[in-house]
Every structure is written in structure tokens, then in C-alpha cells.
Amino acid sequence: MQHKYSLLKAVVMTVALCASNVSMAADARMVPTASYNSGCAQTPLALSFFPGFQLPGEDWDVGGLRLDVFVGRHNNVYALDIGGLANLSKGENCGIEVAGIYNQIGSSKGLLQVAGIANYCKDSFVGLQIAPINVTGTVSGGWQIGLFNRVEAFTGLQLGLVNYAYQSKGAQIGLLNIISDSMLPVLPIVNLGF
């Protein structure tokens, strides 16, 4: 019986240590650029059922693990973000974000974002988005993989059935590829922006 508690204690201590290291890394190198950085405290662990019923509250930053049973919403999230239905962040996300249905963030500086239906990033995204639908303001140095990918300004790779970018300095691979601000705005299979 005592061995079970020892294993549990070791797991909790490991998670706490990882979370504190991520928190320090987030403070030292990944300074949030989003306007939502409220200067609130940062927690290594957050548990959410839905906005308004979560610990800690929405105004906190999470630097470690955020577990959203249904839907969770916080300012900035650094490290691992897991949601049963949806993850919502008003500010910046860095690390890994996985949701059953939907992810929504303000911006990212290095994020693997995976969702069952859609990923949305309001501003600048750096990283990899994987979902049937990916929508982002600006991708600089990233990939979008899905059925439909949409971005305003793009540097990287879009891989999907339909890819749309207003401006692109990257590659699109898919059935229909659209770069609005291009000499050849619509091409099948491959479209390159310069």
C-alpha cells in the first residue's frame, strides 16, 4: 500500500518540477506579447469545467498543465493544455494544446495545436496547427494541416484540400490553393508565394 503512495508522490513531484521549470522558462524567454498580459499571478496547474467554474480564475496565467474537462479560459498558457471540448486563451499559448473540438488563442510563439474540428488564432501564430479547419491572422514560420486552412499573411506551409492566404511567402499543397495577392491567385495541387 505504501508503494502506491510513493509512486503517486513521485508523479506529483515530477509534474510540479516540470511545471516550475516551464514557468521559469516562460518568464525568462517567452515574455507574453499579447495585450492581455495582466500581470496576474501564474499557476503551474489549472483545472476547469467551464468558464466561471475553474481553479484558478480566468485572469490567471498557467505555466505548466491546464486540464479543461469541458471548456476552460485563461490569459496566457505555457506548456501543456488539454481540453475535453475546448481550450480558450485570451493571450498567448506556447507548448502543446489539444482539444476534442476547438482551440482559440490570441497568439503563439511556438505551439503544437490539435483539435477535432477547428483551431483559431486571432493574431500571430508560430508552430503547427492540425485540425479539419484552421484559421489564423498571421503565420510566420509555421504549418497548417487540415481540410480548410485560412490565413491573412503567411510564411510556411499549408497542406489541405482548400488553402487560402491573402499574402504568402510559402507553399500551399492541396486540391484548391488560393493566394489572393499573387499573379496566379488560384492554382490546383501546388501554389507558391514569394
Annotate each language-model stretch with its function.
Residues 2-12:
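Bacterial N-terminal signal peptides that target proteins for export
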Residues 13, 17:
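Acidic, glycine-enriched catalytic cores built around paired aspartates
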Residues 20-23:
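N-terminal signal peptide c-region/cleavage motif recognized by signal peptidases
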Residues 26-194:
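Surface-exposed, glycine- and small/polar-enriched segments that build interaction surfaces at terminal
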